[in-house]
Every structure is written in C-alpha cells, then in structure tokens.
C-alpha cells in the first residue's frame, strides 16, 4: 500500500488539474464508485479476492453497472491507481497510472458499442510523426493522460522526461477515434 502513496498523490494532482475539462475525475480504488451525470450508470471498484500468500499482478477491477436493471459488465483490471471521469453520459475516460514511470489513457463507451481504446507509449511511438518518436523511445518516464472527449476526438496530454529530455517534454494531442490518427503540438508552438 505504501509503495503507491507517491503515485496516488500524482494521480490526485493531475485529476484536480483536468477536472474542468471533463466531469469530475475521481481516483480509484480510493473513490469506490462514480455515477454517470444522468444517474443511469455507476462505475464501481471491485477489489480482487486472492489468498494473501498468492502474488497477484492484478489488484483491482472497474465494473460498469446499469442502475435501473442492476446488470453489470467488467470494464478492465488495473494495478495501482486510475483517475476516472465521465465525458457526457456516453464515455468513461480513464488515465491508468501503471507505474511510477508510465501511464496510459483508456476510453470506454457506456453502452459497450465499441471496443475500449487504449493509448500508451508503444502505440504513440508507432503513430506520431517520425521526428517526435525519439522523445517516446529514449525517455524512461512517459505519461499519457486523457482530459476530454470532443465528439469523435480524444484530447490527450503527453509528457515525460529522461535521457532524451532531462528537463522534460510536454505535448497536447488530439486522437481521432474513427481513424486512429493523431496530431500533437508543444504548448505555445504550431501543430506537429
């Protein structure tokens, strides 16, 4: 539990920074649950039950429950902490803090009509312009955070530091859900 304390602090600070861009972010597992704005759905945390002698790589799960019918479906398993928010009543947006060195963005639809979209360092390394790839490959701390959904576009913040960028780098990116295309820019510069 103590090992995740700095990670939880980081998640809480980031969640507070981007609250205005989507519904309020809550940090799981501490939050326990998050209702949709219209009250039709509830995202719940489910602790994984395992013998204390067994080492388990997956510590928690997120489940989406329809409040009217009581039906539920598992969204994902996660390790560490996850900052989760609703975008309108349609999307559940999550930044999963996988370790102290990386995070990834995941988007789920409330109605289950699409597969979840996961955007992480390996995916970005394949789809960003070639001139940006060294920042992803050569830095050992890379964080991908989803801030909001605008129609069919995800707004992301990508940042990190390491050997390539000891003072860090920061991008604002737009990811197209239908095409999988991305555009990124450094704050205060032209799009790349």
Model-derived segments and spans:
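Surface-exposed loop and turn segments in beta-propeller and other repeat-based domains
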Residues: 117-138
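Bacterial N-terminal signal peptides
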Residues: 9-20
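Bacterial N-terminal signal peptides that target proteins for export
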Residues: 1-11
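Blade-terminus and WD-like Trp-Asp/Gly-His loop motifs, strongest in beta-propeller folds
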Residues: 32-40, 83-92, 143-154
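Structural motif
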Residues: 52-62, 101-109, 163-174
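Short beta-strand elements that form the blades of beta-propeller/WD-repeat-like
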Residues: 39-56, 90-98, 152-160
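Blade-loop segments of beta-propeller domains
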Residues: 71-85, 89
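Terminal domain-start segments
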Residues: 21-76, 181-189
